[in-house]
Amino acid sequence: MSEVYHLYRPGLKTRLIFSIGILAVLALWITAMYIVFGGEKFGIFMGIFAVYFAPGFGKESLIPIMTAVGCPLAAIVSGIVILDMTLAILISFNFDLLLKIPGIGHALRYATDKSATTLHDHPWVKGLAGTGLFLFMYIPFMGSSAIITTIIGRLLAVHPKILLPIIFSGSLCATLTVAVGVKAVIALWFANPWYAVIAVIVTAIVIVILWKLWQKFIAPRFAKDTK
């Protein structure tokens, strides 16, 4: 999958517009968080959001923590979506340049190898094209992330003008789904802890059953050779 390194190299103007634009949005969001929450809460929230960049931490682990420390739903959703879009845009428009930066380049090469493996393991992503990328971004327990989804998009030669809206919608829907689910479980817990436990178990069972049915009956119909 080395061809990913040679796909889509935009001009300098395009790189600057999109890169500076999304970094400005990120800076405005951080400033707004500081104005709204002040010093102590701001430090706690930003520290937890920073963990989102660490391997193994996704929406399904970050959102419950953010909810537990009292972060409002709007801040959680906006923060995760902006972080996802920041990563997606920077990688989409600067992939070849980022590869040359020590540390970052090594991490991107590792992510590219992981993306190629993921695409091989889930060929339906290619078969379903844009819908496949959306589903991959949306389903949290597949090991998906903005980084992996963006690189898979490059592997499939999907232009950023198509890929970025897919990542945005997938990130927004996934974040809202997890956040609303966590809020519902917390509400059930305060009503009766057993309700919350039963709800989590039933939800987990339903998800596993649906995933198994998808793998067995639906995904093979859309699988395409990724070699």
Regions found by a protein language model. Name each.
Residues 65-66, 98, 152, 181, ...:
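Hydrophobic alpha-helical interface/terminus motif in multipass membrane transporters
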Residues 146-151, 173-184:
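Transmembrane alpha-helical segments of integral membrane proteins
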Residues 57, 82-90, 168-179:
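Membrane-embedded alpha-helical segments of transport systems
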Residues 52, 84-85, 138-142, 171:
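Residue-level hotspots within the lipid-embedded alpha helices of multi-pass solute transporters
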Residues 1-46, 73-139, 184-227:
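Membrane-interfacial helix-loop-helix
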Residues 74-81, 155-170:
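Membrane-interface alpha-helices at helix entry/exit sites of multi-pass transporters
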Residues 47-74, 140-150:
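Transmembrane helix boundary and interhelical junction motifs in multipass membrane proteins
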Residues 23, 27, 123-126, 146-161:
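Membrane-helix boundary/interface segments in integral membrane proteins
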